[in-house]
Amino acid sequence: MPGVTVKDVNQQEFVRALAAFLKKSGKLKVPDWVDLVKLGKHKELAPSDENWFYIRSASTVRHLYLRGGAGVGSMTKIYGSRQRNGVCPAHYSVGSKNVARKVLQALELLKMIEKDPNGGRRLTAQGTRDLDRIAGQVAAANKKTV
């Protein structure tokens, strides 16, 4: 659909569609250790979804589309959560820096994002085009079901 952007569609549906696109393209470099790793020290278990790397990549690209200029540290804050400490009070804990770094590096290899001279990463023109195209597909699919 012309004129539809990422901001116009449901974020959950968009992230699922973008993750499916990244998986289907086969170009996203997925590390070997994805089935062994936790996503932060606040997590007790590894993710149960085997496609979590594609979903995290799609979520990261969407975040960069909305608020460019985010780096590894920003991504760890976004994906952080409450850490339970047993009988002690809970505190905030950041997400895994290695996962955030590998996601950003994999997206750089796809030429969807690039390093920003002011710090962090930002979307490329090709990345913006891809995201708007997928948003148009999601909007068209929603229009058919309504």
Swiss-Prot record:
Q: Does the keyword Nucleus apply?
A: yes
Task: Cite the entry's keywords alphabetically.
Answer: Cytoplasm, Nucleus, Ribonucleoprotein, Ribosomal protein
Indicate where this protein is primarily found: cytoplasm
- Pfam families, alphabetically? Ribosomal_S19e (PF01090)
- Which one of the record's GO molecular function terms can you name? structural constituent of ribosome
Membrane spanning residue stretches = none
Which SUPFAM superfamilies does this UniProt record tie to the protein? Winged helix' DNA-binding domain
Segment forming the signal sequence: none
Q: Which GO terms describe its biological process?
A: ribosomal small subunit assembly; translation
Can the keyword Ribosomal protein be found in this entry's annotation?
yes
Annotated Gene Ontology cellular components are: cytosolic small ribosomal subunit; nucleus
Cross-referenced InterPro entries, in alphabetical order? Ribosomal_eS19, Ribosomal_eS19_CS, WH-like_DNA-bd_sf, WH_DNA-bd_sf
As for subcellular location, the record says: Cytoplasm; Nucleus
Function, in words: Component of the small ribosomal subunit. The ribosome is a large ribonucleoprotein complex responsible for the synthesis of proteins in the cell. Required for pre-rRNA processing and maturation of 40S ribosomal subunits.
Q: Which family does it belong to?
A: Belongs to the eukaryotic ribosomal protein eS19 family.
Outline the subunit composition.
Answer: Component of the small ribosomal subunit.
Write the protein's name: Small ribosomal subunit protein eS19
Native organism: Pagrus major (Red sea bream)
What taxonomic lineage is listed for the species of origin? Answer: Eukaryota, Metazoa, Chordata, Craniata, Vertebrata
- Gene transcribed to yield this protein: rps19
